[in-house]
Structures are given as C-alpha cells and as structure tokens.
C-alpha cells in the first residue's frame, strides 16, 4: 500500500484494505456554505445520502483502535452525527472558535441568528459488532491475568490457612495484605513480607523453612510471569487507542487563529489552520500511524501529518486540489521533536 500520496479519485472508490486507518480526518462538503462543491447536491436529503455513504466507508477502513475526526457546519453537523452514531462510538465533540473570525452578520438570512465564528467537529472511535463501545483491552483482559492465576490462587490458599487476610493484617499491622490477591491488582510478597508471615506459620506448627523454600520457588515463578506480562503490556500500549493527553491542553472549545498569513498561499475556499490541524493529529494518533484524508482540499492534513511523522493517503475529485495537496505535502519535511 503506497503512502504519502494524493489520489485523483472519489474516496468511495478507494482500494484501501479493511481497518487500515489509524486516524481519519474527514472535512467533507458542509452543504451550501462555501465552495462550488458545497452546491452540487440536489437537496439536503441527497447530501445526507452522501454522508451515509462516506460514513460507511470510513467505518470499513478505520482500525479497531482508530479515531475519526469529522468536521461540519454548526447548522448541519447534528444531522451528520445522527448518521455517524450508527457506525461509530462518539467520544467527544469540539468547537473551533475563530479568535480572529468575523464579528458581524453577512447575509439577510442571518438576521435572526447569532453571529457565527465557529466550526464544529466530532470525534469517534470504532463500534463493536454488538454496538457497544469495546476497547482492545476488554476482549483481551483475560490474557493479562491468565499466567498469574495459579500463583494467585496458591497465595489465597496460604492466606486462608493463616486465618484469612483480616487475621494477617491484625497480627502484622500491615495493610499491604488487604488487596493483595485481587484479580487485577496484586503483587507477590517481598522478602520482608514473607518474614512477617513465617511466625504465623510457626504458631500453627508448620515447618517455616519449608514454607520459606515454597515462597522462594513461587517468587521465581512470579518474576518469570512478570517478564511475560511486561511484554504483553508493551504490546497492549502499542495497540490501544491513543489517550487524548495534555500535550496541547485542548478543550472542547478551542480558541484558535485562522492563520490566514499561512493559508492565503493556497487558493482554496475551505482551509483549516495548519497548527490546529497538526495539534489534533498529534493528540489523536502516534508517530508512524496512517492518516487517511477522504477530502484532500488544499492539503493541510497531508502536510501536517507528514510534518509530525505520520503517513497519509488522501483523495479528491478536483484535479486542482490534488496538485495543490501533492505539492504542499512534498514541500514538507518531517520535523522530529527534541527530547526534553
């Protein structure tokens, strides 16, 4: 699969394999807002039919741990959300507040509207076959605990033979044992803990040297299982959906400059600010991920994905947009972040 290319092709005719996209950034026509492409639909219902087709195709290619960003107009995005909710699980919605946007009404139809200087976006994740939200972790949780289970059960039996956790805490004055054998959160007794337990065995007439040897053997098995667990944990971190951390402290309303000093270089009616686009990409994907752009437009998403070390594949039916996006991405070099 060739990456970092803009195809002169309708997105619905793409040849991408299923579940290949780690991040999809869809900035589709808004319907009769701006640009010739916004006025090509017979009516609003015809437009919504296209939204449904785009949504289905995005659902097909979105990875199981992937994220979808869907841009829209403040009047129309609610209708798109109803459709998108059928195919994805909604994570959040956001508002780009244009801090240098227009401050007055520009048409008669806005006479009874508040001045709008925002654009909206929805953020989705994949939905399971049964419709509920299922992360990578949920169906695989048992794999993380399975290796430890014999040790955990052995430890529970040992504690029970000493009178139970309550008696152990009472006699050792150590609350460490209170959650020591839960399924998802526990750790093996360290040498100090074992020395606390041995007198309890002695009080019951048990050979403490034999028990010390048993604990040492079990500890070695625990360390062996822990190595395997850490390996699985690293694999899980690589596969799970990226957490939307505090890299840029983004909130649901994002005040942001339109960056006209940068975007004016590209003759296209609908352009997003490069810096905001880059911050969303970094927040919702990892380096090396594949970003799919169904509507390339001026190429903002393509260029910024490349700048931060992601691969991209983009589509547009406008030959002029394809050339613009291709040239724009080609001019960008990956700019790795300096370690701090």
Segments the model singles out, each with a brief description of its role:
Residues 325-326:
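Conserved SAM-binding loop
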Residues 330-340:
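Positively charged, low-complexity nucleic-acid-binding target-recognition regions
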């Amino acid at each position: 699969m060739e990456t970092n290319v803009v195809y002169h092709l309708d997105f619905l005719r793409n040849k991408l394999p299923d579940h290949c996209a780690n991040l999809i950034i869809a900035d589709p026509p808004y319907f009769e807002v701006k640009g010739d492409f916004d006025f090509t639909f017979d009516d609003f219902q015809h437009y919504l039919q296209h939204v449904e087709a785009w949504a289905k195709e995005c659902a097909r290619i979105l990875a199981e741990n992937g994220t979808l960003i869907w841009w829209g107009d403040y009047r129309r995005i609610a209708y798109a959300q109803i459709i998108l909710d059928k195919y994805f699980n909604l994570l959040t919605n956001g508002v780009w507040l244009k801090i240098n946007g227009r401050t007055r009404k520009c048409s008669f139809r806005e006479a009874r509207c508040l001045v709008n200087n925002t654009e909206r976006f929805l953020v989705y994740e994949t939905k399971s076959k049964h419709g509920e939200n299922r992360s990578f972790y949920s169906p695989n949780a048992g794999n993380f605990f399975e290796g430890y289970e014999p040790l955990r059960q052995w430890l529970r039996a040992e504690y029970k033979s000493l009178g139970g956790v309550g008696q152990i805490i009472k006699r050792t004055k150590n609350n460490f044992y209170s959650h020591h054998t839960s399924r998802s959160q526990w750790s093996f007794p360290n040498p100090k803990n074992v020395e606390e337990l041995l007198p309890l065995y002695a009080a019951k007439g048990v050979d403490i040297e034999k028990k010390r040897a048993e604990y040492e053997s079990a500890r070695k098995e625990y360390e062996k299982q822990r190595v395997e667990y850490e390996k699985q944990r690293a694999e899980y971190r690589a596969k799970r959906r990226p957490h939307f951390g505090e890299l840029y402290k983004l909130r649901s309303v994002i005040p942001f400059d339109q960056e006209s000093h940068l975007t004016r270089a590209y003759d296209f009616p609908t352009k997003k600010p490069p810096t905001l686009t880059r911050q969303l990409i970094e927040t919702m994907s990892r380096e090396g991920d594949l970003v799919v752009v169904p509507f390339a437009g001026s190429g903002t998403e393509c260029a910024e994905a490349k700048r931060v070390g992601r691969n991209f594949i983009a589509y547009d039916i406008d030959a002029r947009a394809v050339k613009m996006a291709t040239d724009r991405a080609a001019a960008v070099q990956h700019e790795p972040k300096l370690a701090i």
